[in-house]
Amino acid sequence: MTETAADLFAARAVIEELRVVHSEIAVLEAKQMALMTALYTLRREEQLDLGVAYLHAGEDAATEIGIALKMSQRSADLLINLGLDLNNRCPATLEAFAAGRIDLAQARAISQTLANVPDEVRAELE
């Protein structure tokens, strides 16, 4: 069975729409991660002001997010940690993720791959 020109055109249109939607989802995932990271930072600052130990301040933000979004605390914690890493160590990756040029899986892979790379080398690799 051969595809007609119309079938090929329709398939290409569907693939292009999939690319657009995939990019839009990435933008929303980046925004969600940024909001989770912002809540963590807010809670951490509040708790440090109240005298909570530096090591534990902000820990419960992942629980709060998990309850609010009906997701596991671990999932929220992973997104918060990714957000902190991208903010602090991988700004080009964060920018690409926020623009929808890469998705969550790619942002996570870049972050993990560059985790133990020295700062001066990481900036060039990123």
Positions of the model-derived regions?
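Peripheral, non-cofactor segments flanking catalytic/redox cores
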Residues: 1-126
